Amino acid sequence: MAVLSKEYGFVLLTGAASFIMVAHLAINVSKARKKYKVEYPIMYSTDPENGHIFNCIQRAHQNTLEVYPPFLFFLAVGGVYHPRIASGLGLAWIVGRVLYAYGYYTGEPSKRSRGALGSIALLGLVGTTVCSAFQHLGWVKSGLGSGPKCCH
């Protein structure tokens, strides 16, 4: 039986925080549906005046949902051997997604680049997962930043 470290609790809290962020974005879409009168099941507005703003709010949420499963996978797996690093990167991803969404909400899609931190953090989580796999396979003896045989 494998035992997770006590520090894996940070990973669990980060996963819970990410759900709160996704729920916040969903609430914003719900409010925008009422404000811009976009009924279910219509995904996008065709209103020439305000439809663009609603569509940006909707896309910010949808794009986050598109990347959410890989985020959770890399957070959970990368956190097995590197819980603090994975949690820090996970929090950076959450902040990045909020910045991305609020940049997108302006109606100027180019402002979503404010959330680039999230993409960088996700790449870091991929790295922690690969490093964890190397450690688990015994290809390296220690983890990130732990001496001459760390995952670089």
From Swiss-Prot:
Q: Name one GO biological process term.
A: leukotriene biosynthetic process
Q: Among its keywords, does the record have ATP-binding?
A: no
Which tissues does the record link to its expression? Predominantly expressed in heart, skeletal muscle, and adrenal cortex. Also found in brain, placenta, liver, kidney, pancreas, thyroid, testis and ovary. Almost absent in lung, thymus and peripheral blood leukocytes. Expressed in mast cells.
Subcellular localization:
Mitochondrion outer membrane
Q: What are the lipidation residues for S-palmitoyl cysteine?
A: 150-151
Record's catalysed reaction(s): leukotriene C4 = leukotriene A4 + glutathione; 15-deoxy-Delta(12,14)-prostaglandin J2 + glutathione = 15-deoxy-Delta(12,14)-prostaglandin J2-S-(R)-glutathione; (5S)-hydroperoxy-(6E,8Z,11Z,14Z)-eicosatetraenoate + 2 glutathione = (5S)-hydroxy-(6E,8Z,11Z,14Z)-eicosatetraenoate + glutathione disulfide + H2O
Cytoplasmic compartment ranges equal 30-70, 141-152
What Gene Ontology terms describe where this protein resides (cellular component)? Answer: endoplasmic reticulum; endoplasmic reticulum membrane; intracellular membrane-bounded organelle; membrane; mitochondrial outer membrane; mitochondrion; nuclear envelope
- Identify the main location: mitochondrion
Which InterPro entries does the record associate with it? MAPEG, MAPEG-like_dom_sf, Membr-assoc_MAPEG
Kindly state which keywords UniProt assigns to this record, in alphabetical order.
Answer: Lipid metabolism, Lipoprotein, Lyase, Membrane, Mitochondrion, Mitochondrion outer membrane, Oxidoreductase, Palmitate, Transferase, Transmembrane, Transmembrane helix
Enzyme nomenclature, EC number: 2.5.1.-, 1.11.1.-, 4.4.1.20
Q: Which residues cross the membrane?
A: 9-29, 71-91, 120-140
Regarding the membrane, this protein is recorded as: Multi-pass membrane protein
Where does this protein act, in terms of pathway?
Lipid metabolism; leukotriene C4 biosynthesis; Lipid metabolism; arachidonate metabolism
Q: Mitochondrial intermembrane topology: which positions?
A: 1-8, 92-119
- The answer on whether this UniProt entry bears the keyword Repeat reads no
Q: Name one GO molecular function term.
A: leukotriene-C4 synthase activity
Q: What does this protein do?
A: Displays both glutathione S-transferase and glutathione peroxidase activities toward oxyeicosanoids, as part of cellular detoxification as well as synthesis of bioactive metabolites. Catalyzes conjugate addition of reduced glutathione to the alpha, beta-unsaturated C=C carbonyl group of eisosanoids such as leukotriene A4 and 15-deoxy-Delta12,14-prostaglandin J2 to form GSH adducts relevant to the inflammatory response. Catalyzes glutathione-dependent reduction of eicosanoid peroxides to yield the corresponding eicosanoid hydroxides.
Which family, according to UniProt? Belongs to the MAPEG family.
**Protein name per the record:** Glutathione S-transferase 3, mitochondrial
Species for this entry: Homo sapiens (Human)
